[in-house]
């Protein structure tokens, strides 16, 4: 179906994509963030991150382009697609590959298999909940393409404008590596914004085992990212707890946006010590 990745150009891949869509009478659906990859250099970069004979979960099969090349290298590819029309296309495109299992369903709702890698051009509208699910399922490695703005949030450090709940929760579980920026021209149809490819490797030790506590604490804190810790703690946890963390030399005058991951974990541990309920 597809030529060798080293021998194909972006124009070739675009033409193949257009022909497949025309053949099956499929139009990309904007509400499902359907932008099909047509850049062989991007595909090669993704393939280079995944060891041979890996077991892979792909979120968003599309017409099966990336799936096809992953299947040539992987031991097994589970690929999830919500759009029934695209399931029909991908089933035909990938019919000769016995190591590919196509799953029709919502990636947020179905159970995931145990895999070595997750690979996906993550749909913008479900990026955050998908990453949370990755963490909860203990996905050890991932290569994801996300909108540039989301990528900056994932990579952001304390004090920066992009820093927030998603930065903290993801960095608690994963070491995140920036691979490369990807322009709109690498997809069809071209999205309005650039994307970025990131590689995520599970930390040997998570900063905190109870993800729910981290979610609850960051939810409280980042409702008021520009307020002081003193103000937030006093409002939600009371003055007795405020006095306790002050006695521990916790910087209560810092702004929420400046709290690094280590400080947030300390705050959670103080809550546990004092039996403070995180609502």
Labelled PLM ranges:
Residues 253:
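Interdomain hinge/lid region at the active-site interface
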């Amino acid at each position: 179906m597809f030529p060798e990745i080293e021998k194909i150009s972006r124009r070739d891949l675009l033409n193949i994509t257009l022909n497949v869509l025309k053949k099956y009478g499929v139009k990309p659906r904007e509400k499902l963030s359907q932008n099909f990859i047509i850049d062989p250099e991007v595909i090669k970069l993704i393939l280079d991150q995944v060891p041979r004979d890996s077991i892979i979960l792909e979120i968003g099969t599309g017409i099966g382009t990336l799936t096809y090349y992953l299947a040539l290298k992987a031991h097994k590819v589970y690929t999830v697609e919500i759009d029934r029309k695209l399931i029909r296309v991908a089933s035909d495109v990938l019919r000769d590959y016995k190591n590919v299992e196509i799953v029709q369903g919502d990636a947020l709702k179905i159970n995931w298999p145990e895999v070595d890698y997750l690979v996906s051009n993550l749909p913008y509208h479900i990026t955050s909940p998908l990453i949370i699910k990755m963490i909860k399922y203990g996905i050890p490695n991932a290569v994801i393409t996300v909108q540039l703005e989301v990528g900056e949030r994932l990579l952001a450090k304390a004090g920066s404008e992009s820093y927030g709940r998603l930065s903290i929760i993801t960095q608690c579980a994963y070491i995140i590596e920036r691979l490369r920026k990807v322009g709109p021209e690498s997809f069809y149809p071209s999205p309005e914004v650039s994307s970025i490819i990131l590689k995520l490797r599970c930390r040997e030790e998570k900063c905190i085992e109870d993800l729910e506590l981290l979610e609850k604490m960051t939810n409280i804190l980042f409702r008021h990212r520009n307020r002081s810790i003193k103000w937030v703690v006093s409002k939600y946890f009371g003055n007795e707890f405020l006095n306790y963390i002050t006695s521990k030399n916790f910087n209560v005058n810092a702004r929420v946006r400046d709290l690094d991951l280590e400080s947030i974990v300390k705050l959670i541990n103080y809550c546990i010590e004092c039996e403070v309920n995180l609502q």
